[in-house]
Amino acid sequence: MPLVDPVIERVLADFERRAEEEQRRTAAPGSPGTNLDDFLLSVGRDVGMLLYLLSTGAQSRRILELGTSYGYSTVWLAAAARSTGGKVTSLELREFKIESARQALTRAGLSSRVEFHAGDCLDTLKTLSGPFDFVLLDVWKDLYLPCFELVHPKLAPGGVIVADNMLLPAMVRPQAEAYRARVRKAGDMDSVMLDIGNGIEVSRKR
């Protein structure tokens, strides 16, 4: 399902071509070891569209992204923010990734919709006041639990957290299971896992 805006679609298509090329390169026999920082590691088209639909459907104006990477999901969230009149606050450890994401957002005409914070996401989260209507959690998986502890009090009633990589890669499944268990014990969260992309947990605060 395409977005209405062809400019945004072209930017997303560029990301998706890069992701396909990365997959082909790493799948080739004898491919050398790679630095994960060089890869998009994006949520993919289906999850991206779901992020857009969930955040626009809920008219989310205060959107938080934990893990900008190169900006694929940021473009989806910024497109949603433009639709709702909102803003995205995006956190990323690596400055060079933020710069790459900025360039993509500029090409998409969405740069005014995103505010970036560089540095450790836990340190940054402590400085953000919230409340947030919509949160995407897509950082290193050992950070999911501490991120949830900091985000949960800042989530608005009716606010949604989407956490990626609940099923894949298999090596992070223990952390994913621990995250899901914690969310479901929170007492004020309704939560479901969806088998799309690499598996996502969608959680809503009552």
PLM regions with names:
Residues 1-134, 141-162, 167-206:
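A short alpha-helical cap/connector motif
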